[in-house]
Amino acid sequence: MIKVNTSLKPADLQSKLERFWQLSGEKVRLIDAEYDLSKGTPVFTIDGKYTTRGWTEWTEGFLYGSAVLQFDATGDKEALAYGRDNTIRRMASHVSHIGVHDHGFNNLSTYGNLLRLQHEGRIEKDDWQSHFYELALKVSGAVQASRWTVIPEGGYIHSFNGPHSLF
């Protein structure tokens, strides 16, 4: 059973969060240095090393989005460059992909966070990048909206499997 400590404050977690972000930065760099992307996107680990499933690329947004969040939390400009450059170079195939349900994982983790950081003034605002990120999110949203399924009580967005599936 989980015990909720209602007296806990964010400041109480400072040292743990510092350690978390230190480890996160190490992992982002390690995956970049050691993982062979020609094998596909890393999905899970075997003996502590990432490997792929071969049939899905649903984690690619996390790969680069984690680097963007690393910058967001720590100011690590190297992580930002890695996340932004790879979003621009490698993530376009996910934007309009109708055969997956992973638009949030892939597109919000990358384009969405980069756009948010621009709006917050955390990274330089560049018009072409802003428009690029916005277009990616609009197209991704349109793909999701095309899955809208009407039911008597309203509706829902079905998965890539079809109206019978919320997966």
What are these model-derived regions, one by one?
Residues M1-F167:
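Glycan-recognition and catalytic cores of secretory/periplasmic carbohydrate-active enzymes
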